Amino acid sequence: MVMEKPSPLLVGREFVRQYYTLLNQAPDMLHRFYGKNSSYVHGGLDSNGKPADAVYGQKEIHRKVMSQNFTNCHTKIRHVDAHATLNDGVVVQVMGLLSNNNQALRRFMQTFVLAPEGSVANKFYVHNDIFRYQDEVFGGFVTEPQEESEEEVEEPEERQQTPEVVPDDSGTFYDQAVVSNDMEEHLEEPVAEPEPDPEPEPEQEPVSEIQEEKPEPVLEETAPEDAQKSSSPAPADIAQTVQEDLRTFSWASVTSKNLPPSGAVPVTGIPPHVVKVPASQPRPESKPESQIPPQRPQRDQRVREQRINIPPQRGPRPIREAGEQGDIEPRRMVRHPDSHQLFIGNLPHEVDKSELKDFFQSYGNVVELRINSGGKLPNFGFVVFDDSEPVQKVLSNRPIMFRGEVRLNVEEKKTRAAREGDRRDNRLRGPGGPRGGLGGGMRGPPRGGMVQKPGFGVGRGLAPRQ
């Protein structure tokens, strides 16, 4: 069999899936993605109010990660770009939303430079990691502009899951609520990008434990939060102490019961990250038709289309989900109870935000007011009070006349459960009746050539876990 080299896009997306899964499940292990010369930046300001500086080296990165107090961290990935870079490395850019400790989702952008580890082919570690929240860069806070955007942020997995995107070995490994299926959907069509001539990095740190699986070498995944650094020799001093730590704790043993017996997961420094890249994804279109029964592809395609056909107009929504429309103003990223909010429709197109706020201030203290002027008239918006009493007061005084002549369409904001119920009803009433489940289990790798599966992580730890 011919073993193909995984494309940068495939490497990047597999790394992203593994990285953010670990961020949710075991953030204290994230430092294993990095090496002695890795750099890491995770937004925020220092004590002087200036952008925080990068930290270098596995130990300092571990301290920095622990200082972030990542707890129950959930990530919605909206887009992943990956390109080949110098010395057979891969640069990965991630855009999405992140919620830490059950707080509101915040839009972020993160860039990784994955460098070859050196001891095994297709094994990488994170050489540079740069993370920024967009609200810190552009000022103010960005909230989900309206109900529709909340739906998209919270239910991405409802839209994209297809049988071919994630094979059994990876599908059983991570929680789709942690990493949005947007990323998985793109995995069906990775584009192999030309990689520059290899310029070997002699100083990469060898990891003996990773060499145990030579047929499918492991990509050394390097990390999630932020890093800025150019060339990096391999981390060597920490390797010995880390290997001892790795022998005492193995994620592979924890997750092995969930993995299919046919796909062995390499035992690396960061076994939890080492998940196989689906062999089907690099070039699904290149498989010879002669190897596939003549009628089955069409049937499978129809099934896939039915499963993916969750209203087509929802596809582009994630783009505007966090207030990306030019007319939507930046707003504070605070999640208020639905009982404190009102939907305001039929707003005059020239209405001023301060004028509207003063109008509703007569009913109670207005803590936030949003106007959506995306081009469709009349405009609409939301008013947020500090208590539910003003909301009921406004509703009981309907009809509400603005400027004495404009009747506003004032409604209580629907709860999330009500919105979800409406969506389910709409789907059940759609063409063809209720949809069948997506079930059937994930399909395994297709017939044809195989692709070497990347692995991530240097497998270096600090002291044994406490």
Curated annotation (Swiss-Prot):
Mg(2+) is required for helicase activity. One of its GO terms (cellular component) is focal adhesion. Changing K50R: In 10KR; abolished ubiquitination in response to heat shock, leading to decreased stress granule disassembly. In 6KR; strongly decreased ubiquitination in response to heat shock, leading to decreased stress granule disassembly. Keywords: Acetylation, ATP-binding, Cytoplasm, DNA-binding, Endonuclease, Helicase, Host-virus interaction, Hydrolase, Immunity, Innate immunity, Isopeptide bond, Methylation, Nuclease, Nucleotide-binding, Nucleus, Phosphoprotein, RNA-binding, Transport, Ubl conjugation. Phosphorylation of the acidic disordered region regulates stress granule assembly. RASA1-dependent phosphorylation of Ser-149 induces a conformational change that prevents self-association. Dephosphorylation after HRAS activation is required for stress granule assembly. Ser-149 phosphorylation induces partial nuclear localization. Residues 11-133 form the NTF2 domain. Disulfide bonds: none annotated. This is Ras GTPase-activating protein-binding protein 1. It comes from Homo sapiens (Human). The gene is G3BP1.
